[in-house]
Structure formats: structure tokens, C-alpha cells
Amino acid sequence: MKKRLVTLLAGLLTVLSMGFGLAQFSDVPAGHWAKEAVEALAAKGIILGFPDGTFRGNENLTRYQAALLIYRLLQQIEEELKTQGTSPTMEALAPEDLEALKNAVQELAAELASLGVRVSALEDSAATKEDIARLEAMIAELKAQPMPEPGMDQAALKDLMDRVEAASIAADTALAQAQQLAERLDALAQDVEGVKGDLAGLRSQVEANADAIQALNELAVLLNQDVLSLQDRVTALEKMVSGGQELPDLEQFATKEDVAAVQEFAAALRSDLVGLSDKVSKLEEQVAELNKVRYSISGSLSATYGTVVTDTGTNFDIDRLFPGNAFSTGTYGSFSSSVQAGDSNQGNISGGSASLTFGVKVAQPGTSGVNVSEASATLQVPAAFGTAYTSAPTIRLNAASVKGNVDGQAFSVVYSRAVSSFKFNDYLFANDNDSEPANPRQGMVATFSATKFPLAPEVTVVAGVAGPDATKDTAPALNGNYFGIRTAVKPFSALNLALNYATNLGNRSAIGVDGGLELGPAKLSGLWVSSQTPGSPFADFFDNTLSDWAYYAQAEAKLGPLSLSANYHAVDPQYADGQAGMSENEDTTYYGGEKAGAPYGADTRGLGVSASVGFGPVTLKGYAESEGDYNLAPGSVNDAWGVAATLGSFRGFSLTGFYNAAYTGGNGYFSLTTAVDAIAPGVTYYYTIENQKYSSSWGVRVAHDGKAEDALIPTLNLTAQYATYYVSGHTDIQVYADLAKPFKLAILSLSPGFRYHSFAGAGSAPTYTTLKGGVQVSTDPLLFGLSLDGAVSYRRTQYTNNPSNVTTYELYYRAGVKLQDFLAPKLNFSVAYAHYEGDQLAGTGLPVVGSGNQAFNFARDRVYRSPDPIAAPWLATPGTQAGKLDGFYIEAKYYDLTVAYGEFVLDDLNGTNPNFGRGFKISYTVKF
């Protein structure tokens, strides 16, 4: 059949080559015996050659190429059949020959597929290197012998081939076992990592076994390479057999004894692998036993030496010059920005501390009785050394915790020496956000999930003692012993309820309930807290004239594109400063409300509704609120309502129009008594609030979002707004822009920004115009890791009325050089110079500290000091503060080692009142 196929193909190709122009290939030499056939097939489109114009006739034909040639040939035949005309091809081939040709092609495709399977099987097989070497030697010896007479023993050859294949399969099985063991060893290594201290001896065994497995894997790779070579030889033998040629007797090439030796070697290899597997299994059992309980030790050591002083004792801020410098005192208390606190006169800042944490963790704790899953304890030496010698530094238990279960029900107990953290609800025992702390609390917090009890309550118990901090809060929310218990239940999935009791011995006691309910698209939530002083009967908790109440009810609903919300609330004035609720989060003495999380302020009673709905690109919003003091005293009620419509987003642009109305002096809800420009500027209303809520205003705003996917100008944020405060007749225009991410220009990264603000005040209000611009720039690392960075920000506010012809300005700039991996990897060095100055700023004297950091916030006027419209634009009046601050700063860091030095001077604009400051600091922290 194969001979007939070859004959038919040759004839067909010859016929196809008739009557067509000849194609030329650059590498088919003239006079070559196949040149005519090659050119004829190329002209017919069956052979196309390579893109470089060559035929590459000496390269092997792949199965893919063969399939492509046959496919093109069949296409040619089918096209000629469809024409139902005459052609050289059709005339030269008889119908029976054509049918035979198709059948032969299909048979050839099947044989090619079968050959692919056999080749893949041979590629996946493996044999030992020694056996292959022996077979190769025998083949070489056989080739050297003269060819015997025809008549080889076909049965012997088949037997030899069967034994070789069996040996390959055995070796392949051994290789698979070795690979499986290698994977098991990798997983084992991860477990061993967690118990390094207890498995030092076992690790050496595992590493030795891993080396052995690696060696076996490498051997298997070499064997596979040898098998590929042997495969080529076997294929050649198969071709000789299929071609009808007789081969020499291969008994003398490889006897049955030789093959048996190969099988014995494979069996020995398999036995060794089984033994190794047993060892690994034993190691895994030992690791599992050790992993039942894991122990850990961690801690840190830190030391600082240095001093920061000024020659005059003036404690001025240096964060304005160098953000994130090593001398910064950061933010604390009511300071929301580090520029509001002085840094330059800290004095001796030397000291050291140490901490050590011991931990234990049970991998699979029991579920019957009391079971501990993990526990930890932290010892601390807060003043390992300080500014004065002490022979016995204080060592204290700083924190401890235990987690586990009781009959499968989770529990936890946490102890803290000074910052015990817990919160029952917004108005009771809210003490989880004052980490400095201003109100030190030493105590425990225990939780228990009683899932096997009726209603599966979640119980929280807190107990401890608290006290004041003489330097921070002398009237804290908790003072003395305290205790509280909270029980939360969930009768069904949509309802949750919690009952609370809390007491601060000798000061306050309180009870409360809070919860929530979900009804389809609606959500309801609320709370009630009643607090009273000691000595009052329990019944007084339920009389709001004899106890202090805080309560609210909130409702939310979402109906398709429509969202609705409503609230009613009342908070007794005794909840101010967190007193009635025993909540340091609400402290105003030290934190100034910065930590507050309660939704409604003390001494308030009111209600409000809001709604929003979207129709395609249009969104409508509205609100209405009315609130007075807790007793709704006459004249205390403030009302506000407003609407806004936004069209967007198109290519990042949106258009918003808004209208608001604000009233004060009411005697009841929504009495709309006296229209005002804004309600409580700086408290209720502030300049950057959304759509100028709580003011009497209308306006329009166009904005472009540089982060939008379809932004017209990617990364560009642009806002332009016009607003009128119609009660007094003020008008306000602001336009500002910045980039959502730095702009890359060659080696430069640029973050520019711009602001224009014009306010025209009516009556006695000021009229002024502010221009502000700035840019932050840095370069990519240049030669030897050197890079440059800098920044500049400038604002100028010109007052033309009330007061007239007054100009206030601020200027800040910084330039620096950084060296990364300087002299050694991870050694970074930087040096910078910075300058800040201003005139006619809010306040008097020198600009010792800032009002806030707005240097590169272009939605605000100020750089570091007011005047600024944040409370209300008509309140932004200039002052008489003027001065400048200069300095240079050097810092080197190597991992957690920091060395810093800086010199600074605060002076008036004329340079006649200098205050010099100097700082030096070396600090290092080791964590283990």
C-alpha cells in the first residue's frame, strides 16, 4: 500500500507541475536532480518556501509540514473537482486512482498519528545509564562485524525489544517515585521551618535525603537524554524491519541475561526508594507531633542618643521644612498635623527600651472542656536607660492574651497595662481610639461566643482601673475602677440586639441597648443609653429628667436607583467630653474631638432626611435637617435643606448645580426662622463640605477627574466652582488643578498644582484674591544612585477691601540630594536645604508653628498658616504674624540605623531676631 501511495503521489505531483511557471529558490542549485520538481510544486502553490526566499532542501520534514503539503494538495484536487471541467490533473488520474490516493493519504495520516504516540511514549521512558552504555557498546560491536547471511531470528529480535521496553518502564516507574518523594520533601521543609529549634537533628537528615533525591532527579534527566538517543536507534531498526530488510541476529548484541541484569538494577533502585520513603514518613510523623504545640519568642531593642535644643528656648516646628525628619514629635492631642507641634527644643532625647514577647500556639486544640489555642505575654523595659542613671530599670508586664474555646465555643482574654481598648457603642464605653493614651486604662477585656446557649449570645466583659494623665487630660472619661458587660444576641439573621451595663466606681453608671434590623431593602438601627451619678436608684435610669440619655434611630432604604435615609437623635449635654458615656474617644480636653466617632454631638436634639436618585448620567441629591439643643430651648433650633444635581461623567467631566438654605433661631423643627450665610461656621459648616451644605448658597461646579478611565486628559484633576451666599451677597470663585499621579518627563517626575480663589464680600466682609502654585519634582537615580528632589509652593492673597491694600503671602521651597546604596547596599544618604517665610499671617509674632499642612493641597488657600477660608471665606482675615524659617538637614540610614543632624533658624523677615536650633540623633532598633 505504501509503495502504491508513493507512486500515486509522485504521479500526481508530476501532473500538477504541468503547465505552470517555475518558481525560483535561492538555495536550490542549478542542475540539482530535484530542482524541476521543487520549482513545479512551488509554482503550484503547494510549496511556498521560507520568508527569506530559501527552500532548505537538506532540512528534515516535520509532521506539521507534511500535513500542510497534503492539505494544499487536497485543496487543489477539490477545486478542480468543483469546476467539473477538464484539467491536466483530472485527465491524468483515473477515478479509481484518485480514490486510492485519498484512502492512502488518510492511512498515512493515521500512521503519522500512531508514530507520534510511539515517539511520545519513548520520550517519556527512562532507562539506567549503565544499561544504555552497555547497549550502545554492543551496537557498535555489531556494526563492526561483517553482515551475516540473511535469515535472522525475528522471534529473538522481538524478545529483545520486549525486554528493553520492560526495563525502560521499570526505570520510568522509579523516576516517578523519586519525583513524588521530592515533592513530599518540599512540603516537609515548610513544616520543619516552623520548628527550627526542635528539629536541628532531623533537618540534617532531611537535607541529606533531599540531596539524594536531587541526585536521583539529575540522574533521571541524564537517563532520559540517553533514552532519546536510543530511541533514534530503535526507530532506525524499525524502519529496516518495516522496509523488508533482514537484520543480523541480535542475540549476541544483548542476551536475556543482560536484560535480566537491567531489571535487577531497576528493582534495587525501587527498593532503595521505598526505604527512603519510609524514612520520610517517619520524619513527617515526628514533625506532626512537634507541631502540635509551637513556641515563639520575639522582641525588640531600641536605643537613641541625641539632643534637640534652641539657644532662646523657643520651641518651633521644623516639619514645615523637612517632612518626616528624625526630630519630629509627630501629631498628638488635638493636633491633626505635625506642623502644629514644636520640635526644636526637646532637649536630651537619649533613651532606650526593650520588649520581649513569648508565644505559644496549639495547632489542633480540643473541642471538649476548656482548651487554649494560643497565648502570648509581652515584657517591656520602657526605660532601659534614660537621661539619668538608675540601677534597677523598671520591668513590667505590658500585655498578655489568651485565646481558646470552651466545648468548641471561642473565648479570648486580653490584658493591657495602659491602653486597654474596648467599645460598647457610640455613646457608651467608647475607648478604642486613644492610643497615646490621654486616659491610661489598665485592665482586661474578655469575650465569649456562647454558641451552644439559647440565642447564641456574644458576651464581652471589661474590668480594670483608669486614671488621669497630668500632662494630657486631667479630667478623663474614666477615673478609678471600672467594669462593664455587654451581651449581644441575634434571634434571627435579620435582627441583632445588645444589652449593656457599665460603671466607673464613684463616678458614673450606665445601662443601654443597641441593635439593628434588616427588612428587605430597608435597614434600621438605633441605640439608647442612660447614665447617672452614684446613689441614684435603678428606676431613675428610665426617667430622662433624672438621668442623662443619649439615643438615636436611623433608617436606610435602597429601592433601585433611589436611596433614602432618615434619623432622629437626642444627646444630653452631659455626654460632652465623653463624661456621661465614660468614652475617652469623645474627649475634647486633650484630643479636641479629633478621635470622636459619635454621629451626633452633645446637647443636641434633631432629625434629618436625605435622598439620592440616579437616572443614567444624572444624579439628584437632597437633604433636610433640623436640630436644636437637647431641651429644644426657644431660639436654639437650626434648619438646613438643599438639593444638588450632577451630570456626568463624560470623558472624566461632570457638571454639578446646587442650592442650599440655612436658618437659625428657631423655636421648633423646621421653623425656618432667620436665614444666615452658614450655620456655626467652622463647626457645622466648613468651606470644603460637599456642595456647600449648611449654608444659604447656590452655585455650579465643573470638574474633571484625572483618574477616570475615559478621562479627556488623563491624570489631570480640575475643578472650577462659582458660589453665591445670597443672604449677605457674598460671591466666591475658585479654580484649582493638580495631577492624580506624577507626570514623567525624561528622568523627571513632576507633580504641579495651581489655585485661583476670588472672594467678594458684602458689607464688612473682606474682599480678596488668592493665587497659589507649586510643584514637587524628583529625578530617577542617576550616576552611583544619586537623585535630586525639590519642592516649591507659593501663595499670595491680595485684600482690596476690609482691609484695603493688604497683601499676605507664604513661600516654601526645598532642594535636596539623595544617594541610594551609597558605598554599601542599603546605605542611603540625603542632604537638603529648605526655606519658609510669610507675612501678614493670622496671629501675631513669629510663625513658630503652622496652622496645618496644605502646601500641596490646591483646594485650600494656605500653605502652612492662615488666613484660609476653611471656616468660611468671609472669616478669612489677615493678621500681623511675619517671619521666616531656614535650615539644612542631613540623614543617613542603614536598615534600622538612623543618623541625623540639622541646624535651623527662626527669624523675623529683617533677620534681626534669630532663634537658632540644632539637633543630632542616632537611633537603632533591632527586631527579632
Curated annotation (Swiss-Prot):
Organism the protein comes from: Thermus thermophilus (strain ATCC 27634 / DSM 579 / HB8)
InterPro entries per the UniProt record, alphabetical: Cell_Envelope_Struct_Comp (IPR051465), SLH_dom (IPR001119), SlpA_C (IPR048736)
Function: Plays an important role in the structural organization and integrity of the cell envelope, bridging the outer membrane to the peptidoglyan layer. Appears to be a nonselective channel.
Chief localization: membrane
Membrane topology of this protein: Multi-pass membrane protein
One GO term of the biological process aspect: monoatomic ion transport
Signal peptide span: 1-23
Cystine bridges: none
Domain notes: Exhibits a tripartite organization, with its C-terminal part forming a homotrimeric 28-stranded OM beta-barrel (OMBB), its central part forming a long trimeric coiled coil that can traverse the large periplasmic space, and the extreme N-terminal part forming an SLH domain trimer that can interact with the PG layer.
Location of this chain's protein in the cell: Cell outer membrane
Sorted UniProt keywords: Cell outer membrane, Ion transport, Membrane, Porin, Signal, Transmembrane, Transmembrane beta strand, Transport
Name of the molecule in the record: Outer membrane protein SlpA
